[in-house]
Amino acid sequence: MFQTLRNREAAMPFIMLAVLIDMAAIGVIIPVLPVLVASFSANQADQAYWYGVVAVAFGMANFLGSPLLGALSDRFGRRPVLLLGFMGLGISFFGIALTDTLWGLIVVRTLGGVMQGNIAIANAYVADISSPEQRAKRFGLLGAMMGVGFIIGPVVGGLMGAINLHLPFYLAGGLTLLNLLYGYFVLPESLPLDKRKPFAWRDANPIKALRGLAQLKGVGPLVGVVALSGLAQFVLYTVWVLYNAFKFGWGAEENGYSLTAVGVTAVLVQGVLMGPLLKRFKPQRLVIMGLVSSALGYFLWGAATQGWMMYAVIGINLLGGTVTASVQSLISSAADSRNQGQTMGAVSSLNGLMAVVAPMLGAPLLAAVSHFPQGDWRIGAPFFFCSALQVGSLVLAVLYLRRHPQSPR
């Protein structure tokens, strides 16, 4: 429990390190999980189908699990639920390494999806220890730590996977257990006893959580922004590699460099630029600016005619990296201090749902245009779709801004 502002300030590095380790552990398995799933079948169509099943199982588990963990953290505190999440993720990683059946893999990956809700708890933790004015910057720092983890993790995972396919999962499990020990001995609690509330199973219902989020002090349009913007981002993750292969003939190396550039840029924006931007603009304005930047960026990615343009657009889309942290800070500020876990759990649940929906939209859309010759502008259809989603987000954000007018600093 925090008694002083000094203690609250000291807690931020603790949660940032915990999130960095957590994301590095998750990132380690990214290059090898599809290969592991493929090892259970020699048929390429079956490999694609079962990897889709694994991805959907994880996403649905995250959708269902995030509100549950959020509600539990409002009752018992952030620290014990974070520790539970670390333990569950560790078990799931070791389970993946040890299982010798496809259904066993699906079961333990589903467990991992439920426990991945601890990211929502980390966001609630930051909300607990931050004033409303600090939240956007600190959510940005947390996002930067996630980005660093996702940059480091896949590189290490790819190198270890080349040695042994199961080795990255043992490493991920070990990192997560290290996080469990770190959290147990070092991480302080952020939620005072007098700000906790009784647990009710209805609070763990994801549909109820999303409905409550939409009704939260006029932030309904922002919930739409979270959904549409998140869907656009997950569609990008779904199609990026194959899009660049179809349009520019890129292989694994070129795609690896480009994804690293995207990740490094996101870290710089959220970890370095977010603070100075917030000194000049309020989060409401940053959301608008970021969505304009993002809508333009997606359109230009789709319209790119040469590979180098993909890198140029990363720079054009710099402000797009400010949207998530800014929206989260506005939603968090609208929630009561007793409901931060439930609120952040609902946001995480919505993102989990979008992660399930995105492959169902992005992959078929890319497949529908994949027959066009290399370099054809029509191959950019998935990115044009993402741009349209961001325009929709922009309309909702403007609607919110008109209801809650805030001028730049």
Segments the model singles out, each with a brief description of its role:
Residues 161-174, 364-390:
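A membrane-interface helix-boundary motif in multi-pass transporters
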Residues 2-9, 188-225, 247:
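Juxtamembrane intracellular "pre-TM" segments in multi-pass secondary transporters
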Residues 107-147:
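Cytoplasmic helix-loop-helix junction between adjacent transmembrane helices
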